[in-house]
Amino acid sequence: IDEVANGYARSISVELHKDGSASVEDDGRGVPVDIHPELGITGVEVIYTKLHAGGKFDHQNYAYSGGLHGVGASVVNALSKWLVVDSCTGGGHYRMRFESNYDPAEKKIASGRAVTPLERISATRKHGTRVTFLPDDTVFEETKFNAETVRRHLRELAYLNKGLSITFVDEREKDPDKQKTVFMYEGGLSDYVRYINRDKTPLYE
């Protein structure tokens, strides 16, 4: 959403897969893949393993923020069995995988550690980021996504970001006509007011 709010992206897709994982994709600039000058690791690893590393490393990059202050990506990674990042940026498609596994040396679960180096998959003209993750069932009692809860939240985000197109796909849905929903509201909040008043008689137009 930060990419959208700052004019770098116009569409987002959210997919719930049959294996319990979920994917979120945007058409923004893509997660940086260059080496961080101070930490000596790729931008993908910084953003997905370090707290407060959002904003593409530069606080001036975003005039507006969704409010998570750079912790969202790293927290999702830490709470996932595995997470795969696909970043399309600078003419290349890059991929990196993270997993949470037991570390015998430390005698504890090591959450969200990189298990593959950042790999350049191919050249591409595409730009944006796709993240696929599986919630960790050793952390959460319930890991099954509630489609209606996700759908409601995405609808609200579409209302709050006028002109943004959000596509929601639930692969678990048996009815093909209900698998895909697209939210896009050119009127923004005014459309939202009309939506919540759809079963009421308005006093003013």
Located regions from the model:
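Short, intrinsically disordered, charge-balanced linker/junction segments flanking boundaries
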Residues: K200-E205
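GHKL-type ATPase core
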Residues: K18-E38, G43, G54-E186, Y192-Y195
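Conserved ATP-binding N-box helix of the HATPase_c
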Residues: I1-I12, G72-L79
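Conserved catalytic core of two-component histidine kinases
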Residues: V14-L16
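Short basic (Lys/Arg) and small-residue
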Residues: I47
